Regions:
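A late C-terminal transmembrane helix in Major Facilitator Superfamily
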Residues: 140-175
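Helix-to-loop junctions at the C-terminal end of transmembrane segments
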Residues: 75-87, 172-173
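Intracellular juxtamembrane helix-capping segments at the cytosolic ends
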Residues: 128-141
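Extracytoplasmic gate region of multi-pass secondary transporters
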Residues: 18-79
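Structural signature of the two symmetry-related core transmembrane helices
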Residues: 90-104
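Paired small-residue
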Residues: 113-121
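A membrane-interface helix-boundary motif in multi-pass transporters
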Residues: 170-188
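Multi-pass alpha-helical transporter architecture, strongest
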Residues: 184-212
């Protein structure tokens, strides 16, 4: 009886964790999964250094946290509402575009205004990132093994949180300014978004038709 309540994914199948990990779409999703955890952690990890090079007080940087939290919560609610009406494939491909703009602002912007805009934009991605990927795994790989598939996705994000601070710290030690690195992060998010767009567009053709 329990199996009858599960939704199927691509090709009308209930994908196992191993099957999902051997499918190309999972690896298309990996760069997008790594990005927010890697570079969001890096942003917080290097906050003192960032404040110094931007010539703002550390207290001003920390004062952005309530704004970031509020925008993240609002984005979670709005993305969930939009998800029910528009669907995962149409939404998820745009999820990381605010992060592109956010890290451009972090890299090129100055003063408190740049911080406000950057944290607000990154909050949009952070909130949507808490909602849309969960629906993505269920819609494209089915729900029978959703727990183990999401666990692997979570492991990728944990890996990202370890990579980000180390990578950016190495860049600072190598003489690459944090501002230049954040512009490169914006390019990374752009490439991850483009890859995700192409992958989701192709994989959407494999989904079973929606029930009326």
């Amino acid at each position: 009886m329990a199996k009858s309540t599960h939704s199927v994914g691509m090709n009308g199948l209930q994908w196992t964790r191993n099957q999902a990990m051997s499918h190309w779409l999972f690896w298309v999703m990996v760069p997008a999964l790594l990005g927010p955890s890697a570079f969001g952690t890096a942003l917080m990890f290097h906050q003192v250094h960032f404040s110094e090079i931007k010539e703002i007080s550390h207290l001003t940087f920390v004062a952005m946290f309530p704004l970031y939290t509020a925008v993240t919560i609002a984005s979670m609610v709005l993305s969930g509402w939009a998800l029910d009406r528009i669907g995962t494939p149409r939404l998820i491909v745009f999820m990381y575009l605010p992060a592109v703009l956010a890290f451009l602002v972090f890299g090129l912007g100055q003063g408190t205004g740049g911080l406000v805009l950057g944290f607000a934009l990154f909050g949009l991605t952070s909130g949507a990132n808490s909602t849309l990927p969960n629906a993505f795994w269920a819609e494209f790989y089915g729900t029978a093994s959703i727990g183990s598939i999401k666990a692997m996705a979570a492991a990728v994000m944990v890996l990202g949180s370890a990579i980000g601070p180390g990578l950016t710290g190495w860049g600072i030690d190598a003489g690459i300014s944090l501002e230049a690195q954040y512009v490169a992060v914006a390019v990374y998010f752009s490439c991850a978004s483009a890859l995700l767009f192409l992958g989701v567009r192709k994989a959407t053709q494999l989904l079973p038709p929606r029930e009326a």
